Amino acid sequence: MDTTRGLYLSAAGLAIAVLLTAAPGRLPAQQTAAVAIDGDDIGGAVRSPSGPEAGVWVIAETAELPTKYAKMVVTDEQGRYVIPDLPTANYSVWVRGYGLVDSPKVRAKPGQQLDLTAVPAPDARAAAHYYPAIYWYTMMKIPPAKDFGGTSDIPKNITLETWRHRMNNTDCIGCHQLGQESTRTIPAQLGQFKTGAEAWGRRIGSGQTGEFMMNRLAVQLGGVPFKYFGDWTDRVARGELPRHKPPRPQGIERNVVVTSWEWGTEKTFVHDLISSDRRYPTVNAYGPLYGSPEYSSDDMPILDPKTHTATSFRMPVADPNAPESFGPPFHATAAMKPMQPSPYWGEEKIWSQRANNHNGMFDRKGRVWFAAAVRGIENPAFCRKGSDHPSAKVFPLDRSGRQVSMLDPRTMKYSFIDTCFGTHHPQFGYDADDTVWLSGSGPVAGWVNTKVWDETGDAVRAQGWAPFVLDTSGNGKVDEWTEPGQPAQPGKDTRLAGSGPYAVMPHPTDGSVWYTFNVFVGPPGFLRFDPKSKLSEFYAIPKDGIGVRGGDIDKNGVLWGSGSNGTLISFDRRKCKGPLSGPTATGTHCPEGFAYHKYPGPGFEGFENTSAEASYYTWVDHHNTVGLGENVPISTANLQDGFVALKDGQMILLRVPYPMGFFAKGLDGRIDDPSAGWKGRGLWGTNGDRTPWLMEGGKGAKPRAVHIQVRPSPLAK
């Protein structure tokens, strides 16, 4: 908004609105009072034959900027809207909402009063087309309890809880938005099949992840998911519709402003983005966003939201002979070549990379640190047995699939920090050494002392690692331990194993580091690591919680995680009543520390009191970067096209209504201008679905970076 231009409510402006009334999609201006706008806003009212349409979206999109750009707002109780602060361009504007079909697109410019006609859906099927994926996904059936335990084709080791875990936030749902139109239907290009189960058996063998997907469903789950996925899509094809209808945005949800930009390419995905230092959220104010394309490309997307320009940076590796990071032992979920032809890309190899950049994090100096490969998988000698490195003496490491790199945006210098431990998510601690802690480190906690790195450039000296050891001896120090799977022995500690640390969460005040632990293999839960004693504490998710994926820690030390039971799981160590170390403190000793906060959205049949929301990651807004207040946990709402925040005990859905299929794997907050109110802050995320061609727009659609802001009212400009 340019406040120097004043309110654009002149008679001339109103006259323009009147002249436009003959065009499809517009209402006569006299039917509603003009809303207050500036010269860089578009505003008006939305009505249908039933009257004002409250809680629907008005979307403005343009292709006249360097990259495709869209802005979306929600109407107030009188159907009024204001789309603020639009760059100069011609826009297509239309209405989208539950109970409606998209209105005809109308051409408009900033500074224009524009009343719009909403189009009621002619039938239930047309209305359901716009429902979030969760409403369609929950039409799929879950096997009955009697089919588990070896009584059916479901492998005996798979329990009902395991099945729900894998349907809710791992397996297919961890990479794709199941329930969107492209997944609830079978593409014609795939071929003709006798049954839906047969079609799914062919479908998941497609592309460079076909082998991985086939192994998960056909081998580990005995091929039974094909039956349930096939039955689901068969019923959809016959015209069956969701049992539930979504509510329109209410209250604070109507104050949300969403801005999106295309970036990346139509063949690659952007796993995550970073905008600032979560400890100091004014770092990189108004600056570029840096994306992580993981194993789809070495071309890191960069978005400048001020100039609306999307570029890329080619991420190198230190070893010019390093192989591509595909297939075991590099990356088990993708292969060099498609297993079977893709219905979209045929036999083309669309992904190619060596850096495998998974996630980035800003430091307070404005540099970006990445969990990225710098070499092949075999570790150098200083990591291995016989090395004099202090960490290697305790626990030598032979391999790491991904290490650490750093980009200084001021010079575009790219540095390699060769770590012995693997990496996945980086997060800076609150210590004087600006230690960056990494997850994805397998059996150890891994860290890089960035102060030492800055002073010496010596990656060997700057890094350290330690195994996860429970103090089951109870003496407050690391002793001889029993190995994973061995029976406990009096006087010995216990080493933990499994899939290891996933999310990493340095405590803001006490120096400890927390992780979500064993997301994929082993008992899932939260793990606390003490950098001073090198001891760990483990708190297993109770059975009714099923599991956890991404998580974060709030300013009070409470843990928050995306639960596999359709809830936001919290854990407060301060509520534990029993001892936190000793022979009984092995994971199940503090159920009283856990609480569950149900996500919005329906559950599967038979689990109606739950939500099927497949949240991938949770982040806590320490600094009110979004506009909902400090210390607010926010989860990705992967089946509802956006994010969901827990504020004052209420779930607030922050939906990205266009293009449908928004599926984030992380989120970040930034304050661009602390004195600019809601306009100077916002939440950042990107569409992280591995297959952008499955979202609205189809083949050719690119990932979108989004900026979500919460203004004081739906008409704030």
Predicted regions and their residues:
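A short, solvent-exposed loop/turn motif at the edges and junctions
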Residues: 62-68, 90-109
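Short Pro-Gly-centered beta-turn/loop motif in secreted/extracellular proteins
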Residues: 51-54, 82-90, 98, 107
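Short, ordered, surface-exposed loop/turn motifs in non-cytosolic proteins
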Residues: 40-42, 48-64, 88, 137-149
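Surface loop/turn motifs at the tips and blade-to-blade linkers of beta-strand repeat domains
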Residues: 270-273, 313-318, 348-353, 398, ...
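Structural signature of eukaryotic scaffold interfaces centered on beta-propeller domains
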Residues: 264-285, 347-365, 425-433, 493-510, ...
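The canonical Cys-X-X-Cys-His
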Residues: 169-180
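Short, acidic Ser/Thr/Gly-rich low-complexity loop/linker segments typical of extracellular
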Residues: 36, 63-84, 106
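Short, conserved, GDST-rich strand-edge loop motifs in beta-rich repeat architectures
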Residues: 181-189, 284, 291-295, 301, ...
